[in-house]
């Protein structure tokens, strides 16, 4: 009622028809560690896995983490992944999101594009094998926790930008989000974070917008050893990748 009286478009039917969905996580193996992340419409699971897969052929442990060599290599891998994000990623219930984006074979192809001596142009996205058939069916908070019974939780929640839409429905204390900005208003038009999207993330009824949330669990020998997530819009993906590298490649404690 309040939304209708104040120019909003959301009605009771919209709220009643919204259902939380259980989805299969994105999984990859990075140097003997199983990386388990969230699938589309979050781009985090796909591209955390993709970036780590691109970097796996390189022996990062031999590099200083603050060296130009390390920074260049990781940056180039991230650029390749974000080019794919802009083209392919969206709600997999509406868009054809290739599972091959997180495959080892595809990552090896992308890794060969990295020139260790200079930044290479990334003119467009690449295309993984079976892209048409093998598909996936700033004001952010992340927390990770575990209990004595062995349950591990990694959770990211967001209202998108600072204070979301800037609206609090009287009597609720709830800040309404502005997640509509995470859709691509039109192909090639940046959102508030400067991210470019394509038709895969176009607005449609009942569709969920693309996000960068990356709640991740890392396992070794089938047992969880740490969880990781972050806040910060598109930098969530890169922060999570760097945290995993620090633990797996450089031996830092979780």
Name the predicted role of every residue range.
Residues 34-40, 47-51, 143, 152-156, ...:
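Short, well-ordered beta-strand elements
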Residues 22, 137-140, 162, 211-213:
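Short, small/polar residue-rich loop motifs at catalytic or cofactor-binding pockets
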Residues 1, 53, 230-252:
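Alpha-helical support elements that line or immediately flank enzyme active sites
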Residues 1-39, 60:
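Long, well-ordered, tryptophan-enriched scaffold segments
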Residues 8, 57-159, 171-172, 179, ...:
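Internal maturation/activation junctions in enzymes
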Residues 9-11, 151-220, 226, 237, ...:
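Active-site rim segments in enzyme catalytic domains, especially the processed small/beta chain
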Residues 41-42, 131-136, 201-210:
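Short Gly/Pro-enriched turn/cap motifs at secondary-structure boundaries
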């Amino acid at each position: 009622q309040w939304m209708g009286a104040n120019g909003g478009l959301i009605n009771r039917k919209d709220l009643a028809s919204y259902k939380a969905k259980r989805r299969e996580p994105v999984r990859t193996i990075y140097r003997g560690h199983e990386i388990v992340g969230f699938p589309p419409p979050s781009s985090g699971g796909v591209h955390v896995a993709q970036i780590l897969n691109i970097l796996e052929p390189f022996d990062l442990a031999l590099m200083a983490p603050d060296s130009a060599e390390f920074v260049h290599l990781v940056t180039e891998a991230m650029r390749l992944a974000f080019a794919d994000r802009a083209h392919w990623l969206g709600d997999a219930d509406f868009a054809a999101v290739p599972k091959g984006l997180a495959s080892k074979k595809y990552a090896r192809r992308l890794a060969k594009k990295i020139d260790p001596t200079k930044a290479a142009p990334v003119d467009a996205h690449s295309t993984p094998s079976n892209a048409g058939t093998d598909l996936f069916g700033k004001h952010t908070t992340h927390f990770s926790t575990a209990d004595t019974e062995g349950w591990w939780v990694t959770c990211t929640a967001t209202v998108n930008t600072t204070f979301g839409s800037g609206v609090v429905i009287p009597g609720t204390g709830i800040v309404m989000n502005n997640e509509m900005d995470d859709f691509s208003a039109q192909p090639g038009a940046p959102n508030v974070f400067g991210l470019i999207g394509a038709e895969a993330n176009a607005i449609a009824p009942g569709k969920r917008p693309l996000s960068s949330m990356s709640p991740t669990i890392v396992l070794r020998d089938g047992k969880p050893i740490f969880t990781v997530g972050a806040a910060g819009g598109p930098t969530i993906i890169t922060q999570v990748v760097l945290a995993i590298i620090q633990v797996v490649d450089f031996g830092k404690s979780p």
